[in-house]
Amino acid sequence: MNTNKIGVLLANLGTPDEPTTPAVKRYLKQFLSDPRVIDLPKFKWQFILNYMILPKRSPKVAKLYREIWTEQGSPLLAISRQQQQALQDYFNRQNQNVLVELGMSYGNPSIESATDRLIKAGVSKIIVLPLYPQYSSTTTASVLDAFARGLTQQRNIVPFEFIHSYHNDPLYIQALANTIRLADDEKLLFSFHGIPKRYQTEGDFYPEHCQKTAQLVADKLSLSNEQWLVTYQSRFGDEEWLQPYTDETLEKLPSQGVKKIAVICAGFSADCLETLEEIAEENKENFLNAGGQSYRYIPALNANTDHINALAKLIEAKI
């Protein structure tokens, strides 16, 4: 063990290995089998998942992935690799003995394999950074579960720090604000990934984090309350999710006099299917068809310099 080497585990959701129906089916099965994501009784849910949902959804989702797939593969994985390399370069420039690895909750590279690589490299401490600014049991807690599984075969558990959230971090807020330039009469919509409403009532304070992030960015931009709003996207199933829903809101706004909209997905650290297809394409079409005149998607922070610096400072505070 190198007593001076620090390991950093960047963690995100994950992606299929390729945009094919079998690969997407494997990915969705792993993702939707996580009780942190779907907490229905296991036997009942597995029957529904395997015999009703996966056969129907896998081909449709694979088609959507093919539309955004790049030469580097999945946008989420490609951008996450860029983030990993940019952070590694940052610590190298600072002459800090830090090794940055990337792991995904679902798919490859797994969090368990990334944890194993860090331990085999002889790190004396691991800093786990889930790339979810707003805490949720459905995302952040799943990272902790996977990290713990990665430690199960280790005789000696190295000390670790777990970054719970950074929804109100000043550098993260500034990085978001730096990407936003509103035109005249343009309204700003913060679209966060939704969770079932029931999860909030059971103690998940994700929506409070989302509201706080949006408020801080709006304050940084000196926006009035009439210039921005928060909605929630990507709902799944019949259960009520956090509202207002992004898609329904965008379809109603033109009739309410909002003709120009800018949409930012502040909870996504990297662009992915939910931003590139659902928000940048599908919801744009819906808004314009409903009478909107201008729709602008503001890309995720991805590997831009402000974002990397914000993440680096979060990590440095734990070294």
Curated annotation (Swiss-Prot):
It catalyses: heme b + 2 H(+) = protoporphyrin IX + Fe(2+). Fe cation binds at H193, E274. GO terms for cellular component: cytoplasm. InterPro entries: Ferrochelatase, Ferrochelatase_AS, Ferrochelatase_C, Ferrochelatase_N. It is found in: Cytoplasm. This is Ferrochelatase. Keywords: Cytoplasm, Heme biosynthesis, Iron, Lyase, Metal-binding, Porphyrin biosynthesis. Catalyzes the ferrous insertion into protoporphyrin IX. It comes from Actinobacillus pleuropneumoniae serotype 5b (strain L20). GO terms for biological process: heme biosynthetic process. Pathway: Porphyrin-containing compound metabolism; protoheme biosynthesis; protoheme from protoporphyrin-IX: step 1/1. The gene is hemH. Its EC number is 4.98.1.1. The lineage of its organism: Bacteria, Pseudomonadati, Pseudomonadota, Gammaproteobacteria, Pasteurellales. CDD domains: Ferrochelatase_C (cd00419), Ferrochelatase_N (cd03411). One of its GO terms (molecular function) is ferrochelatase activity. HAMAP family: Ferrochelatase. Belongs to the ferrochelatase family.
